[in-house]
Amino acid sequence: MSRRLLYLLLLFVLAGLLLFVPMPIAPTYAGRTLENAGHTPLFFLVTLGVLFTMRDHPRFPGVRLYALAGMIGAGAGFISEVIQKPLARDASWEDVAADAVGAVLALAVYALFERRTKMRAWHRLGALAVALSCIAIFLTPIVRMTRAYVHRNGEFPVLADFHSRIELYWTLSFGVNREIVGDALEVEFVADEFPGVAFHEPVADWRNFKTLVIDVANPAAEPLDLGVRVHDRQHNHTFNDRFNRRYPLAAGERRTLRIPLEDIRNGPRQRLMDMAHISDIKLFRGGQAGSRRLRVYSLRLE
């Protein structure tokens, strides 16, 4: 076995370990973004490894080498996602696309620097354009994530105020439609069982504050049974391990809810809430009847 082929096999083994062995990645926006972004450099290296391993093979000169490496790189990415599906792993078409971007980037970078194949200047310019496009695709979600964190941290102790669409990066829907209209988040409850919107991953340390202030309105002609729940990173996903409270809103009523943080701290039954690591705030409809609309103006700490 040639040394190049051995290196390629080791690279495939390493790629398999990175894809299928659970990694200690935090369940945060940053963690998810960086985990997804990692597919592109991984399959860039896999495809580049195929190119360097097979470049001296007489059956794959010129364009054939690029076709082989591209098919192996992109195909390996697709197969890796197919394999993850029955293993209850987080397989997605987004990951397949990221794998393909890595493979195409490897082909473009290789074309820029290899001199065995006779290429015209415009071929190399095309390869440069493709490489830059792939790098832009790779960097876009990372830049978007960075902007979201800078915005979130700069607004604190305001947790959400909906003056910018960046706020939507920190909201999750559970059986609702949501959209920013003016300076408020308009929420339409669609599902019947506890639909709501979560404000995920706020600035976590609330220890220097006394009150959670939520400015909301019920714009509908029916009353709304509004539920508020808050939990920390230790939350075990049970009702008794978080703060829960209901607030009835009359038809057309706008109200500022003021929740003492001491109440939130004492929310879990068997322990105290970790006020240095708050993870999630959720506003939801408590019952199946009543208003199907909620307007959220802001959430802040005082």
PLM ranges: what are they?
Residues 1-94, 100, 104-204, 209-215, ...:
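Bulky hydrophobic segments
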Residues 87-90, 221, 271-272:
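Short, solvent-exposed loop/turn segments at secondary-structure boundaries
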Residues 214, 256-299:
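Extracellular beta-strand ligand-recognition surfaces/modules
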Residues 216-220:
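Asparagine-centered strand-capping/turn motif at beta-strand->loop junctions
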